[in-house]
Each structure stands twice: as structure tokens, then as C-alpha cells.
UniProtKB/Swiss-Prot annotation:
The gene is YFH7. Gene3D superfamilies: P-loop containing nucleotide triphosphate hydrolases. Keywords: ATP-binding, Kinase, Nucleotide-binding, Transferase. InterPro entries: P-loop_NTPase. It is an enzyme of class 2 (transferase). PANTHER family: URIDINE KINASE. It comes from the Eukaryota. It comes from Saccharomyces cerevisiae (strain JAY291) (Baker's yeast). This is ATP-dependent kinase YFH7. ATP binds at G31, S32, P33, G34, S35, G36, K37, S38, T39. One of its GO terms (molecular function) is kinase activity. ATP-dependent kinase that could be involved in endoplasmic reticulum membrane assembly.
Length: 353
């Protein structure tokens, strides 16, 4: 079993080490289907946030949000802007770019939009269209910390790769839609274009620095340091999740807020050495604030887990069908990951048998 408390300590130590140079740190957590990566990511996130909530309960009124940020962050200035008529055409096509659904070289583009909460934002879309959109909220109203419940301030946030599954409508437009649906979960059935763009955005925010009027000492805790270095200038970033009942992405399910100092990215292909996936590691590693974990587990153990999950989510009607689906798709994806793992020295391998 994975010691998630030890992982939490390692992540907080990285944040402590880098807090003068990086606004946030990132964690990559990779494993084959059924390896437990989602559960581990959720536990890790919960442990870190609970530790911070305990700190806040013992140190009331410690949080400060200022507007001192270096450099001033412009997250998507290099992206092409869609014109209103182009946005209208995209919406008319059910939020898709019909000629680019399989184009892994399609460059993400941006346009003015609204979040699910009806806030002004910049939407960033790629070959998956609006289903896999990233939405960056407009920075405007200052945060009033006194009106925030302390247990609502989370410094860790998970970002599952699942939200970047191409929608079923998108897969329908593939040259071979039948195979695309059957092999859903393989590398080509994710919007790797926009997930890489998300990593570029996170890297930019990571490299921002916030000055503080407070002098920190060697005895100052990491929670004390980060509580004095939240920035109003860091925008909220909304990313999609995945609804297993609907079998499609759901918009704005996760929010990477200005309080998020640890981003836990979990998924199958984040260390994959092909197409856009191969650029993710370097994009985040170049910030100097990255931890990378690969979960190793025997395929015999994952077969039953995944078969039961397929049955519970309604993808199959019997456990036997679930096992067959695992062998014809999930197992292939797991082996693909192992055969195409990027070659870097700092991947920490952990067992979860």
C-alpha cells in the first residue's frame, strides 16, 4: 500500500524549498488503469488540505492576499483569438472543430466566454472543442479573506486527466469512429493538445513570485510562509472533469484557484513519450518545482478492480464482460504506458499491490 502521509510530507517539503521561487508546485501521478492513482491523488490532496485547515484553526487571521506578483502573469497571450463569427460557427458545430478532431498538431485557441458560474473568462479550446475547454477567470474583484470560511481554503487541488477525454460526439467524427469508441481511453482519444496547454499555463503560474512584508525565519513553517504570499493577481483556472454516468466530460468541474499552491495531476499518459504527451514532463520540470510518481502494480490485481468499475458504471452488464473489456482495452493501454515511459531519472516508483 502507498503511504500517502509520507507523500504529503514530501510534497510539502518541496513547496517549502521552492516557496521563494515558485508560486505553486506540481505533482505528476501516473499509473495504469486500476492502479489506484485517482484514490491516491484524492487521499494526498485531502491530507494536505486537512493539515492546512488545522494550521488555520490554530492561527486565525493569518492569511493575506496581496497584489504583488513578479512577473505579472499573462497566461495565454500567445494564443490566436477566435473572432465572434468563428465562435458562432464552433457553437453551431456542437462546440467542435470538425476538420481537426484527430489533429494532434492543432494549436489551442482562445475566445471570450463565461464560466459555469456566469463569470467573465477566457476560454481555451483545442481539437476536443468546448467539452475539454480550460477557462481562465478575469481577475477583478479583490478577495475578502474575512468572508471566507477557513475550511473552504484549500491549498491542494487534483486535476484528473479524465476531463480531457474526447467527447463521444467528437469520436463520432473520427475517420474510424467504431474503433475510436472501442479504444476509448487510448492516447488518441484524449485532447492532449489542450492538456499540454493546461500544463503550460500552470508552469507560468508556478514561476511567479510574490513578495511579502513579513520576514521569515528558518523556524517558520511552510503554512506560515504561504499564508502570507497569496496573490490577487493569480486567476482562477477552471478545468473539466468526467461524468462516468453521462460518459462524457463535464465543464468547470475543478478550480485551480489563487489559493492553490499544490496541483496534483493524475492520469495514464502524463509520462508517455509520444506526441503532445511527451512535452508535459519538460514543461513542468523546467519550473524546478515538480515531483513525479509512477505507480507499479501487477495486471492481475488491476483486472478485477477495473472489471468491477466497468460494471458499476454501466459500461458492461456482467463481471465477465468487464474482464473482457479490460483485456481488450485497458490492459493494452497499461502495457502501452509501460512500453513508452519517458526516460528521465527522477521518476519515483511506488507499489500499490
Amino acid at each position: 500500500m502507498v503511504d500517502t502521509h509520507k507523500l504529503a510530507d514530501d510534497v510539502l517539503q518541496l513547496l517549502d524549498n521552492r516557496i521563494e521561487d515558485n508560486y505553486r508546485v506540481c505533482v505528476i501521478l501516473v499509473g495504469s488503469p486500476g492502479s489506484g492513482k485517482s484514490t491516491i491523488a484524492e487521499e494526498l490532496c485531502q491530507i494536505i488540505n486537512e493539515k492546512y485547515h488545522t494550521f488555520l484553526s490554530e492561527h486565525p487571521n493569518v492569511i493575506e492576499v496581496n497584489d504583488r506578483l513578479k512577473p505579472m502573469v499573462n497566461l495565454v497571450d500567445s494564443l490566436k483569438t477566435l473572432q465572434p463569427n468563428e465562435v458562432a460557427e464552433m457553437i453551431e458545430n456542437q462546440g467542435l472543430f470538425k476538420d481537426h478532431v484527430e489533429d494532434v498538431n492543432f494549436q489551442p485557441i482562445k475566445y471570450s466566454a463565461l464560466t459555469s458560474n456566469n463569470e467573465e473568462c477566457t476560454a481555451v479550446v483545442a481539437r476536443g472543442g468546448t467539452a475539454n475547454a480550460i477557462r481562465i477567470a478575469t481577475v477583478d474583484n479583490p478577495v475578502n479573506v474575512n468572508k471566507l470560511a477557513q475550511d473552504s481554503i484549500n491549498i491542494a487541488q487534483i486535476v484528473p486527466m479524465d476531463g480531457f477525454h474526447l467527447s463521444r460526439r467528437c469520436l463520432d467524427l473520427f475517420k474510424d469512429p467504431q474503433t475510436a469508441h472501442k479504444r476509448r481511453g487510448s492516447p488518441s482519444t484524449f485532447d492532449s493538445n489542450n492538456f499540454l496547454q493546461l500544463c503550460k499555463i500552470l508552469a507560468k503560474t508556478s514561476l511567479c513570485k510574490v513578495s511579502s512584508h513579513h520576514k521569515f525565519y528558518s523556524t517558520s513553517s511552510v503554512f506560515e510562509k504561504l499564508s502570507k504570499t497569496f496573490s490577487q493577481k493569480i486567476p482562477d483556472i477552471f478545468v473539466p472533469g468526467f461524468n462516468h454516468a453521462l460518459k462524457d466530460p463535464t465543464p468547470d468541474q475543478y478550480c485551480i484557484s489563487k489559493f492553490t499552491r499544490i496541483v496534483i495531476l493524475e492520469g495514464l499518459y502524463l509520462l508517455y513519450d509520444q506526441e503532445n504527451w511527451k512535452k508535459i514532463y519538460k514543461t513542468l520540470a523546467d519550473t524546478g518545482a515538480l515531483l513525479v510518481y509512477k505507480i507499479d502494480i501487477d495486471y492481475e490485481a488491476t483486472e478485477e478492480r477495473v472489471a468491477k468499475r466497468h460494471l458499476q458504471s454501466g459500461l458492461v452488464t456482467t463481471i465477465a464482460e468487464g474482464r473482457e473489456k479490460f483485456r481488450s482495452n485497458d490492459l493494452l493501454n497499461g502495457r502501452d504506458i509501460d512500453n513508452h515511459l519517458i526516460k528521465v531519472d527522477n521518476i519515483v516508483h511506488i507499489r500499490n499491490d
